[in-house]
Amino acid sequence: MKISSLLFEISELVEKNVGYITQIIGPVLDVAFSPGEMPSIYNSLVVKGRNSAGQEINVTCEVQQLLGNNEVRAVAMSATDGLMRGMGAVDTGAPLSVPVGETTLGRIFNVLGEPVDNLGPVQNSATFPIHRSAPAFTQLDTKLSIFETGIKVVDLLAPYRRGGKIGLFGGAGVGKTVLIMELINNIAKAHGGVSVFGGVGERTREGNDLYMEMKESKVINEQNISESKVALVYGQMNEPPGARMRVGLTALTMAEYFRDINKRDVLLFIDNIFRFVQAGSEVSALLGRMPSAVGYQPTLGTEMGSLQERITSTKEGSITSIQAVYVPADDLTDPAPATTFAHLDATTVLSRGLAAKGIYPAVDPLDSTSTMLQPWIVGEEHYETAQGVKQTLQRYKELQDIIAILGLDELSEEDRLTVARARKIERFLSQPFFVAEVFTGSPGKYVSLPETIKGFQMILSGELDNLPEQAFYLVGNIDEAAAKAAALQAGGQ
């Protein structure tokens, strides 16, 4: 019995295309194959063996370049510790494939589609390759509709498009990941939608916190994992650049299955798209390509386009993508955020100044934009209210220098009124989050779009001029602000 199984393994190995490692430079391997047996670009190679300590090695690599002299250059998807020249590398004959479908919900995967949550293997036969073409023009859906998030500042001033691409821009520590967690929470609870979260090159601690948070809020159901609303794919900061560069594609592939086969609306979160570019830059340098502007890879636009063009709405379903974009040194002209801008339908820009004031979410109401904020899409009432809010805040911004030099008393009566309303608007744009209850001590609030519009209309019209501005801070709808004002008044007497 043992001899027959050994013969089977040997015959299987002979059938496979096996090369051997000739050079290892960090996560990059050069592999030599027999003449006429060269693997294709993006094929995955598997290196198995034992290191000098006798421990098993199993490293998957992706072919990136054909070098000539029957050699290929491949990038490893996991650590290359213990690999040696002369080790065998088996050509699988296909790109990386990952599990897809309902059984991925509630689970955490790595870039290879292997579960890393200690809950056992995925009971699933369906797999998709991570390299796929974008949908054809004829399959695309061009209908415009708003995606309500329950977050006042987003829904009013920079609404998201269903099936669109949204960028969350901000430097370190201004609240991008908290905003993403709130969106996952609101969408799962209010819309019953399925989400896929791609953790690309971020902190492992944040990934773990997000997982625990999702279990607490029942977005991931521990008792009945099949009722979970999200699949998680992580390629964190400690992973090699190959894994960080491809983990976004793994998450996108899982989302595409829900859209194309299950015909559902899906939310794809990528935190952080900058790390995808950064990993591509590292791989590009390791492959010996000449760097482009600011040291980025010359193929920056192509790599970004191949990912972004697959994120779209078809006649079968939609993928709405929300991408956190780390802005290096808060410089929006850096090639990485600038390239990302070109693909987005809406931008949510987070402001360090607002975060310093304690206004959360620290979304900049004047810098954030959306192609959806048009009167024929959102309606006249919404559009006029949003424009009124922006004009009031813009006037307040212009008056701030005068206030700093001369004080409020030197302003005209009209300008003093504008400043008072702008300060109320600024505070009313803050909102307690469900996922931040432990920090703020305030229960989270989901505010519907009609309630949001009504609240800001009342502030703009002057109906609430007699209420103190602190009554508008960290509340949900306008009724809560009025109740808070009454409580403040009662407390002050």
From Swiss-Prot:
Q: Which UniProt keywords apply?
A: ATP synthesis, ATP-binding, CF(1), Chloroplast, Hydrogen ion transport, Ion transport, Membrane, Nucleotide-binding, Plastid, Thylakoid, Translocase, Transport
SMART domains from the entry?
Answer: AAA
Topology in membrane: Peripheral membrane protein
Gene Ontology terms: biological process:
proton motive force-driven mitochondrial ATP synthesis
Q: What is its EC number?
A: 7.1.2.2
The record's subcellular location field reads: Plastid, Chloroplast thylakoid membrane
Role this protein plays: Produces ATP from ADP in the presence of a proton gradient across the membrane. The catalytic sites are hosted primarily by the beta subunits.
Complex and partners: F-type ATPases have 2 components, CF(1) - the catalytic core - and CF(0) - the membrane proton channel. CF(1) has five subunits: alpha(3), beta(3), gamma(1), delta(1), epsilon(1). CF(0) has four main subunits: a(1), b(1), b'(1) and c(9-12).
Q: What is this protein called?
A: ATP synthase subunit beta, chloroplastic
